[in-house]
Amino acid sequence: GKEFDFPYLCRRMLANNLEIPKALQVQGKKPWEIIHQDTMEMWRFGDRKNYTSLELLAEMMGIEGAKSDLSGDQVHDVYYKEGNLARIESYCMEDVIVVAQLYLRFHFMNLVEPHNIQKL
Protein backbone atom coordinates (compact mmCIF):
# COMPACT_ATOMS: atom_id res chain seq x y z
CA GLY A 1 0.00 0.00 0.00
CA LYS A 2 0.85 3.67 0.01
CA GLU A 3 2.01 3.78 3.63
CA PHE A 4 4.72 1.11 3.52
CA ASP A 5 5.03 -0.95 0.35
CA PHE A 6 5.23 1.88 -2.20
CA PRO A 7 7.73 4.03 -0.29
CA TYR A 8 9.87 0.99 0.52
CA LEU A 9 9.89 -0.27 -3.08
CA CYS A 10 10.66 3.20 -4.45
CA ARG A 11 13.56 3.72 -2.04
CA ARG A 12 15.00 0.30 -2.89
CA MET A 13 14.68 1.02 -6.61
CA LEU A 14 16.50 4.34 -6.24
CA ALA A 15 19.20 2.75 -4.08
CA ASN A 16 19.72 0.11 -6.78
CA ASN A 17 19.64 2.62 -9.65
CA LEU A 18 16.35 1.27 -11.04
CA GLU A 19 13.73 3.43 -12.72
CA ILE A 20 10.55 3.84 -10.70
CA PRO A 21 7.49 2.73 -12.71
CA LYS A 22 4.99 5.48 -13.57
CA ALA A 23 2.30 3.79 -11.44
CA LEU A 24 4.49 4.40 -8.36
CA GLN A 25 5.33 8.01 -9.22
CA VAL A 26 2.56 9.52 -7.11
CA GLN A 27 4.26 12.60 -5.66
CA GLY A 28 2.43 15.81 -6.51
CA LYS A 29 -0.58 13.98 -7.94
CA LYS A 30 -4.14 14.48 -6.85
CA PRO A 31 -5.85 11.41 -5.33
CA TRP A 32 -8.05 10.93 -8.40
CA GLU A 33 -4.98 10.89 -10.65
CA ILE A 34 -3.50 7.87 -8.87
CA ILE A 35 -4.52 4.52 -10.36
CA HIS A 36 -3.61 2.51 -7.25
CA GLN A 37 -6.38 1.07 -5.07
CA ASP A 38 -5.28 0.20 -1.54
CA THR A 39 -7.48 -2.49 0.01
CA MET A 40 -6.75 -1.12 3.49
CA GLU A 41 -7.97 2.34 2.43
CA MET A 42 -11.01 0.77 0.79
CA TRP A 43 -11.90 -0.87 4.12
CA ARG A 44 -11.32 2.28 6.18
CA PHE A 45 -13.92 4.33 4.29
CA GLY A 46 -11.98 7.46 5.26
CA ASP A 47 -11.57 6.47 8.93
CA ARG A 48 -7.88 7.09 9.70
CA LYS A 49 -7.93 6.38 13.44
CA ASN A 50 -8.64 2.64 13.39
CA TYR A 51 -6.50 -0.22 12.13
CA THR A 52 -7.67 -3.65 11.04
CA SER A 53 -5.09 -6.35 10.37
CA LEU A 54 -5.13 -8.21 7.08
CA GLU A 55 -5.74 -11.44 8.99
CA LEU A 56 -8.82 -10.05 10.78
CA LEU A 57 -10.18 -8.41 7.64
CA ALA A 58 -9.83 -11.65 5.67
CA GLU A 59 -11.50 -13.59 8.49
CA MET A 60 -14.43 -11.14 8.55
CA MET A 61 -14.82 -11.46 4.78
CA GLY A 62 -14.63 -15.26 4.81
CA ILE A 63 -11.35 -15.40 2.91
CA GLU A 64 -9.01 -18.28 3.66
CA GLY A 65 -5.24 -18.19 3.85
CA ALA A 66 -4.52 -15.14 6.00
CA LYS A 67 -3.47 -17.11 9.06
CA SER A 68 0.29 -17.34 8.97
CA ASP A 69 2.95 -18.19 11.48
CA LEU A 70 4.68 -14.99 10.41
CA SER A 71 3.80 -11.30 10.40
CA GLY A 72 5.41 -8.35 8.65
CA ASP A 73 7.21 -7.15 11.76
CA GLN A 74 8.94 -10.54 12.07
CA VAL A 75 10.36 -10.68 8.53
CA HIS A 76 13.57 -8.87 9.53
CA ASP A 77 14.46 -11.45 12.17
CA VAL A 78 13.45 -14.41 10.01
CA TYR A 79 15.77 -13.12 7.29
CA TYR A 80 18.75 -11.94 9.32
CA LYS A 81 18.65 -14.37 12.25
CA GLU A 82 17.21 -17.49 10.62
CA GLY A 83 18.09 -16.90 6.98
CA ASN A 84 14.77 -18.57 6.13
CA LEU A 85 13.87 -17.12 2.73
CA ALA A 86 11.39 -19.93 2.01
CA ARG A 87 9.31 -18.91 5.03
CA ILE A 88 9.31 -15.25 3.95
CA GLU A 89 8.42 -16.23 0.38
CA SER A 90 5.48 -18.31 1.60
CA TYR A 91 4.28 -15.46 3.82
CA CYS A 92 4.47 -12.93 0.96
CA MET A 93 2.72 -15.27 -1.47
CA GLU A 94 -0.16 -15.82 0.95
CA ASP A 95 -0.42 -12.07 1.55
CA VAL A 96 -0.71 -11.37 -2.19
CA ILE A 97 -3.43 -13.98 -2.58
CA VAL A 98 -5.42 -12.63 0.37
CA VAL A 99 -5.14 -9.01 -0.84
CA ALA A 100 -6.27 -10.05 -4.34
CA GLN A 101 -9.25 -11.90 -2.88
CA LEU A 102 -10.16 -8.88 -0.73
CA TYR A 103 -9.98 -6.65 -3.79
CA LEU A 104 -12.42 -8.95 -5.59
CA ARG A 105 -14.75 -9.02 -2.58
CA PHE A 106 -14.71 -5.21 -2.27
CA HIS A 107 -15.75 -4.97 -5.93
CA PHE A 108 -18.49 -7.60 -5.54
CA MET A 109 -16.69 -9.98 -7.87
CA ASN A 110 -16.40 -13.73 -7.47
CA LEU A 111 -13.45 -14.92 -5.42
CA VAL A 112 -10.92 -17.21 -7.05
CA GLU A 113 -11.46 -20.75 -5.81
CA PRO A 114 -8.43 -22.07 -3.87
CA HIS A 115 -7.99 -24.96 -6.33
CA ASN A 116 -7.60 -22.38 -9.14
CA ILE A 117 -4.75 -20.52 -7.44
CA GLN A 118 -1.37 -21.64 -8.66
CA LYS A 119 1.55 -20.76 -6.43
CA LEU A 120 4.72 -20.34 -8.45
Regions found by a protein language model. Give the residues of each.
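Metal-dependent phosphoesterase core characteristic of DEDDh/y 3'-5' exonuclease domains
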Residues: G1-E89, E94, L102-H107, L111-N116
